[in-house]
Regions:
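Mature extracytoplasmic domains of secretory-pathway proteins
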Residues: 54-90
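Post-signal peptide N-terminal segment of mature Sec-exported envelope proteins
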Residues: 25-44
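Short, well-ordered, aromatic-rich surface patches in folded extracellular/luminal domains
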Residues: 18-28, 93-134
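Positively charged n-region of N-terminal signal peptides that target proteins for export
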Residues: 1-4
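Bacterial N-terminal signal peptides
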Residues: 6-12
Length: 134
């Protein structure tokens, strides 16, 4: 009986951890300063306009908001968490060709990482762009 209650306690803790991740919001700013706001099952893309770009020419396209499946959302969040936790690809300051990933939870706890080009960053951008195509 004691093991049963221990098992139930573990399940409750794990389910709360899952809920914590769902309540996280992420913002990804790519190397061109296009912004991707990622919240529960939604990606909101806010591109930079030519008038805002350093070149005065680059335009990130049209704004778009999409709903993503739970599977896609979970995949995006899992990779975002890996990137935030493993700061191997972190740069100390924002320079050309870097991107920034931010996270904020429901208690307003914030984390961020400045990213140099890497395979994980490329994969993360690919997941976001694929989600926006749907």
């Amino acid at each position: 009986m004691r093991y049963f209650f221990s098992l139930i306690a573990c399940l409750v803790l794990f389910s709360q951890c899952k809920d914590e991740k769902i309540k996280m919001n992420y913002t990804y700013v790519d190397q061109n300063n296009n912004r991707y706001y990622i919240s529960q099952f939604t990606i909101d893309y806010r591109p930079i306009k030519a008038s805002e770009s350093s070149s005065g020419v680059y335009d990130g396209g049209e704004e778009k908001t999409v709903t993503v499946s739970e599977v896609n959302y979970t995949e995006i969040v899992a990779l975002a968490e890996q990137i935030l936790e493993n700061k191997y690809h972190e740069n100390l300051k924002r320079e050309m060709l870097t991107a920034v990933l931010y996270s904020k939870d429901q208690d307003d706890n914030k984390r961020s990482v400045i990213l140099k080009p890497s395979e994980k960053r490329t994969l993360f951008e690919k997941l976001l762009k694929e989600a926006l195509k749907k």
